[in-house]
């Protein structure tokens, strides 16, 4: 799976960078989590700082175009993002981490 960054837009007000990217894959469309991990590695960021919003694969193509928000800190992601987006990206809130450990 190869990831190419198409566009990066700084959003200093929300402490994030909006990223449009393209993924070329050999098999079926990769999962949201595997794309998130690969994009985080490409950008030298922690996976919890990356929130994948959209993945779009055209029928029959082995190319996926996506949109992600890359935060400066995981705390900013938890403060700004909606709960369902955090769930989809497996980003756990602070209160939930403590409940899981118990």
Curated annotation (Swiss-Prot):
Domain of life: Archaea
Name of the protein: Small ribosomal subunit protein eS24
Biological processes per GO annotation: translation
Gene of this entry: rps24e
Matches recorded under InterPro entries: Nucleotide-bd_a/b_plait_sf, Ribosomal_eS24, Ribosomal_eS24_CS, Ribosomal_uL23/eL15/eS24_sf
Source taxonomy: Archaea, Methanobacteriati, Methanobacteriota, Stenosarchaea group, Halobacteria
Family membership: Belongs to the eukaryotic ribosomal protein eS24 family.
Native organism: Haloarcula marismortui (strain ATCC 43049 / DSM 3752 / JCM 8966 / VKM B-1809)
GO cellular component terms listed in the entry, alphabetical order: ribonucleoprotein complex; ribosome
A GO MF term: structural constituent of ribosome
PROSITE patterns (alphabetical): RIBOSOMAL_S24E
Keywords of this entry: Ribonucleoprotein, Ribosomal protein
Record has Transport as a keyword: no
């Amino acid at each position: 799976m190869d990831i190419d960054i198409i566009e990066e837009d700084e959003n200093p007000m929300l402490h994030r960078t909006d990223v449009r990217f393209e993924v070329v894959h050999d098999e079926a469309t990769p999962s949201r989590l595997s794309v998130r991990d690969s994009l985080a590695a490409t950008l030298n960021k922690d996976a919890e700082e990356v929130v994948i919003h959209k993945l779009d694969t055209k029928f029959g193509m082995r190319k996926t175009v996506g949109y992600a928000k890359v935060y400066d800190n995981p705390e900013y992601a938890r403060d700004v993002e909606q709960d369902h987006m955090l769930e989809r990206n497996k980003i756990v809130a602070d209160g939930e981490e403590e409940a899981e450990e118990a």
